[in-house]
């Protein structure tokens, strides 16, 4: 989901340019890795994932005017109120996102895909983009 979210932020013209996957003996999957994506405007996303690491689901957007960070995205439980911090030079401001229920939203999205053909077509396109990114990751990381 790291690449899917980065693709959403960078836009559909983003390309995967580096990928590294690492395994641990005794497991049949890649346990951790990293990737770099870039869009046509030269905006870069650096991604890392790991199933053998301390749990994190962070995002940091770093630009010339400041930085936005959030320590809990995409997997927050129902009712959890995530925060984000805006940093400009050495000034920090922490704000809250409204509590949400990501699991319920995913079920509602699934139902909407079943009931609405336009939503379904849009979701197919998003899934195809994600499939292409995963295949490119495997190619760059030399995963069979």
What are these regions (language model features)?
Residues 40, 109-144:
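C-terminal helix-rich "cap/oligomerization" subdomain common to oxidoreductases
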Residues 2-76, 107-118:
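Contiguous beta-strand/loop segments that form the cofactor/metal-binding neighborhood of enzyme cores
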Residues 37-41, 84-91:
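Short acidic, glycine-rich loop/turn motifs
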Residues 15, 81-85, 94:
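Ser/Thr- (and often Asn-) enriched beta-sheet segments in non-cytosolic proteins
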Residues 2-3, 81, 104-108, 134-135:
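A general structural signal for well-ordered alpha-helical segments in protein cores
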Residues 28, 99-103, 120-127:
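Aromatic-acidic/polar surface patches that form glycan- and anion
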Residues 78, 94-108:
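Active-site loop of classical SDR/Rossmann-like NAD(P)-dependent oxidoreductases
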Residues 59, 77-89:
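Short polybasic amphipathic segments
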């Amino acid at each position: 989901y790291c690449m899917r979210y980065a693709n959403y932020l960078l836009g559909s013209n983003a390309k995967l340019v580096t990928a590294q996957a690492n395994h641990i003996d005794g497991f049949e999957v890649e346990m951790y890795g990293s990737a770099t994506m870039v869009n046509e405007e030269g905006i870069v996303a650096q991604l890392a994932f790991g199933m053998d690491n301390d749990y994190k689901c962070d995002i940091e957007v770093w630009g010339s005017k400041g930085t936005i960070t959030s320590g809990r995205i995409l997997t927050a439980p129902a009712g959890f109120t995530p925060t984000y911090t805006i940093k400009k030079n050495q000034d920090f401001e922490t704000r809250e996102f409204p509590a949400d229920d990501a699991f319920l939203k995913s079920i509602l999205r699934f139902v909407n895909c079943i009931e609405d053909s336009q939503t379904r077509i849009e979701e197919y396109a998003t899934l195809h983009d994600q499939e292409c990114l995963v295949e490119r990751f495997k190619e760059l990381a030399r995963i069979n």
